[in-house]
């Protein structure tokens, strides 16, 4: 094979090239494996720039638009969902240089189709056009074939070794793979064998062969990493995890080297035919990214849609609250995750009795734990992915009987794994079906007819693995209760409800669990906190610190199944005969609230004509939409529950209890802005990205998914790893069920206090300054009084004035 480097005046230095490679690695988001998948902001690398600039950058890098088609906005204008005042306000807020001169010009632009987004070409794409061979497809297929084995987490019986790193492992495979040469890339195996043994040296060598200028590096490297889809993002996940522990990981750089070797080989194979087109492409990569007038128009229309939704939300919050305030002691208090799915259940539960109070807090309940399940050595990080575990916990007591049960469970698990490998092994799999098929008839019927009833996790109660001294336990309890704004007025029964989802035949099941628990269900954290707050020594210490929990108050953990709205109480953790009547009443209320919530959800779910259909759907192998998860999420509200109680927020708002009057120094407010708000933004923007650009930022069609390596899904039998949400998670087959809107964050706190915190956290501030999130300060009556205008400035919110229209029933 010969290589034909393009003309280049000055070759960038090694350090300059590697620095550009590292920047490109941070321009793509990480992808968590299926076992603990969490929502990730697909625009994580573009948070420092506004929507129009990110749109211009991703158009070049991925060939996608990151707003809806103009027709989507035109329909909303015509129907009145977007009012002229929304359009005018968004226009005035846009960059003056490129925005339409006036409202009529903007309305005219809405009717015109925007130019189709076009990515800058790679060498593989130029070679495809020249040779009529699908080189991009071949590159993706061969890299995907290797990567599925390299990143495998136990699915493959014969795993690819990982010694030496991704680049070295790929070279071993590629030097024996004749597929590229059969397709027409002569001498590719020899070319790879002769390439530098070190990934960084290979990158530098390829840059020289490709004739890349320094200015072209960032854009071109970013472009190549986007062509890798989820494989590049999985490598970015490894870097993310390494950096959390103060280390680093070269996997992204290794994959970039692999992709560059393909590019250099294809350019050399194409000879002079590809050089003119490639030189034009290099020049285009070297041009600075600049937003066009179309990018600005699209960003204006997107903001207008968001202002329309904010106007309706403002009317809901300004209307008189229908909630009744009970006199005397509260009968039941129940703390839920802030997840939007909890809003429906909380509203249903509170409607049953004025003596019921619910609270909202991040579902990990302030306990950053690494947890080992019963009979397992795998440590599960049950906390937001932005954090690292501070405490290790395990299931079961440290007793001889527990140890015997642990050993028995481990032996059974190993036998099950051995049987599973026997079923799939190269030789035994052929005889397996004929020999043992009849044994599985009953199971096939039970599963195929959705007769099996899944149960909530019921492991032994969790405990700290190494024990915690009293001062540590007391500090944790104090911090958590203050963060929950829950320091008084305790009921006799306080339920701490984590949440999870019981579904079948769903590779993305963990994405339905609690994002604040790292993609796991939340019962472990809830059970740990209940034990902590029932500790008599902790209660005595809390009383000395001014938090008095009555002696008759019992804390219990629960698990809210968001698919069926069933609630499991972990009463065995803390038996209390004196609370038998309280528990009986609570069970009755929870059953009734579940029925109300299922009835509300059934209206939105396809083929769920009755609330009774919900449970059957959760057990149905063929059900591709067991629940809508967080589709429709629109707002994050941190305020006292009295501001939202009784108001129909339609399961579209994250609800976090917060009272700034009891937050000395605004430490709790700082925690909310830097943790739950950021996690909610990741969720919101993943839904946004999977809706506006499903072909690139979404996971594709569930019906075509195949799990690969136990880490992710591909469509069909190979290729790139898909990321984001499946199309069925945002679309019901006829229309979108998720309205792509950037999250509106509403906080009841003094605007100057919020601004002070933003000033201390530049990365969080950038999300608001560049309007990836909208920010409002609520006044003392819960109205959206102040809008954040960027650069630590606030303005009066026109729609936050006292509303005269009290007829708005819900967010729509």
From Swiss-Prot:
Gene Ontology MF: a single term: zinc ion binding
Protein's cellular compartments: Cell inner membrane
An annotated GO cellular component of this protein is: plasma membrane
Among the Pfam families in the record, one is DabA
Chain sites annotated for binding Zn(2+) = 337, 339, 499, 514
Does this entry carry the keyword Cell membrane? yes
Going by the UniProt record, its keywords in alphabetical order are: Cell inner membrane, Cell membrane, Membrane, Metal-binding, Transport, Zinc
Membrane-related topology note: Peripheral membrane protein
Q: Which cofactor does it need?
A: Zn(2+)
> Subunit info?
Forms a complex with DabB.
User: So what does this one do?
Assistant: Part of an energy-coupled inorganic carbon pump.
So what family is this one in? Belongs to the inorganic carbon transporter (TC 9.A.2) DabA family.
Q: What name does UniProt use for this protein? A: Probable inorganic carbon transporter subunit DabA
* Organism of origin: Xanthomonas euvesicatoria pv. vesicatoria (strain 85-10) (Xanthomonas campestris pv. vesicatoria)
């Amino acid at each position: 094979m010969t290589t034909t480097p393009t003309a280049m005046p000055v070759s960038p230095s090694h350090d300059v090239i590697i620095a550009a490679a590292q920047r490109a690695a941070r321009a793509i988001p990480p992808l968590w494996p299926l076992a603990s998948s969490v929502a990730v902001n697909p625009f994580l690398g573009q948070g420092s720039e506004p929507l129009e600039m990110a749109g211009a950058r991703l158009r070049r890098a991925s060939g996608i638009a990151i707003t809806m088609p103009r027709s989507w906005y035109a329909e909303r204008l015509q129907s009145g969902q977007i009012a002229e005042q929304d359009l005018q306000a968004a226009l005035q807020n846009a960059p003056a240089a490129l925005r339409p001169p006036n409202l009529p010009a903007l309305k005219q632009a809405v009717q015109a189709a925007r130019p189709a987004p076009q990515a800058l070409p790679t060498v593989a794409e130029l070679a495809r056009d020249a040779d009529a061979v699908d080189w991009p497809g071949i590159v993706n297929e061969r890299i995907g074939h290797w990567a599925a084995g390299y990143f495998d987490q136990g699915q493959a019986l014969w795993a690819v070794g990982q010694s030496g790193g991704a680049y070295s492992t790929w070279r071993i495979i590629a030097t024996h793979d004749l597929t590229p040469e059969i397709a027409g890339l002569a001498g590719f195996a020899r070319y790879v064998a002769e390439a530098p043994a070190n990934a960084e040296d290979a990158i530098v060598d390829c840059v020289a062969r490709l004739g890349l200028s320094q200015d072209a590096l960032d854009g071109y490297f970013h472009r190549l990493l986007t062509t890798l889809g989820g494989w590049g993002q999985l490598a970015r996940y490894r870097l993310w995890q390494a950096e959390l522990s103060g280390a680093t990981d070269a996997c992204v750089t290794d994959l970039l080297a692999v992709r560059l070797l393909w590019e250099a080989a294809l350019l050399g194979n194409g000879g002079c035919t590809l050089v003119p087109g490639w030189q034009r492409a290099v020049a285009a990569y070297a041009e600075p990214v600049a937003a066009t007038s179309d990018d600005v128009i699209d960003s204006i229309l997107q903001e207008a849609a968001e202002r329309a939704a904010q106007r309706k939300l403002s009317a809901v919050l300004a209307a008189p609250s229908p909630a009744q305030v009970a006199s005397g002691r509260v009968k039941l208090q129940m703390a839920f995750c802030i997840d939007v799915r909890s809003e429906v259940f909380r509203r249903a539960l509170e409607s049953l009795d004025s003596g019921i109070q619910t609270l909202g807090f991040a579902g990990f309940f302030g306990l950053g734990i690494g947890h080992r399940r019963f009979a397992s050595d795998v440590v599960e990080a049950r906390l937001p992915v932005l954090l690292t575990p501070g405490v290790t916990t395990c299931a079961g007591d440290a007793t001889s009987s527990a140890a015997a049960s642990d050993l028995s469970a481990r032996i059974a698990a190993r036998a099950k794994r051995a049987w599973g490998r026997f079923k799939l092994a190269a030789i035994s799999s052929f005889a397996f079906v004929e020999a043992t098929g009849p044994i599985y008839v009953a199971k096939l019927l039970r599963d195929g007819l959705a007769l099996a009833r899944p149960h909530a996790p019921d492991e032994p109660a969790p405990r700290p693995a190494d024990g915690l001294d009293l001062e540590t336990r007391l500090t944790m309890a104090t911090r958590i209760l203050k963060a929950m704004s829950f320091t008084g007025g305790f009921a006799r029964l306080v339920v701490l409800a984590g949440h999870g989802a019981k579904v079948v035949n769903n590779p993305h099941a963990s994405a339905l669990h609690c994002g604040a628990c790292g993609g796991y269900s939340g019962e472990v954290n809830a059970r740990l906190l209940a034990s902590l707050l029932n500790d008599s020594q902790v209660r005595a210490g809390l009383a000395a610190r001014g938090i008095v929990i009555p002696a008759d108050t019992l804390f219990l953990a629960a698990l809210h199944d968001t698919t069926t709205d069933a609630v499991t109480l972990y009463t065995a953790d803390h038996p209390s005969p004196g609370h038998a009547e309280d528990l009986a009443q609570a069970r009755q209320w929870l059953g009734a609230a579940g029925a109300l919530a299922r009835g509300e959800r059934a209206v939105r779910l396809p083929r769920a004509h009755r609330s009774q259909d919900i449970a059957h759907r959760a057990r149905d192998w063929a059900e591709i939409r067991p629940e809508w998860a967080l589709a429709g999420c629109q707002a994050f509200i941190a305020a006292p529950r009295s501001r939202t109680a009784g108001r129909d927020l339609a399961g579209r708002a994250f609800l976090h209890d917060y009272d700034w009057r009891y937050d000395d120094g605004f430490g709790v407010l700082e925690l909310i802005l830097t943790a739950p708000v950021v996690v909610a933004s990741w969720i919101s923007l993943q839904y946004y990205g999977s809706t506006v650009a499903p072909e690139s930022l979404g996971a594709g069609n569930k019906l075509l998914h195949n799990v690969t390596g136990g880490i992710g899904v591909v469509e069909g039998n190979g290729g790139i790893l898909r990321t984001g949400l499946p199309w069925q998670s945002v679309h019901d087959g006829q229309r979108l069920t998720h309205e792509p809107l950037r999250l509106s964050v509403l906080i009841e706190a003094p605007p100057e206090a919020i601004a002070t915190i933003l000033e201390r956290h530049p990365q969080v501030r950038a999300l608001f300054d560049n309007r990836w999130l909208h920010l409002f300060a609520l006044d003392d009556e819960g109205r959206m009084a102040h809008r954040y205008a960027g650069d630590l400035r606030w303005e009066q919110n026109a729609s936050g004035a006292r509303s005269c229209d009290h007829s708005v029933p819900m967010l729509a």
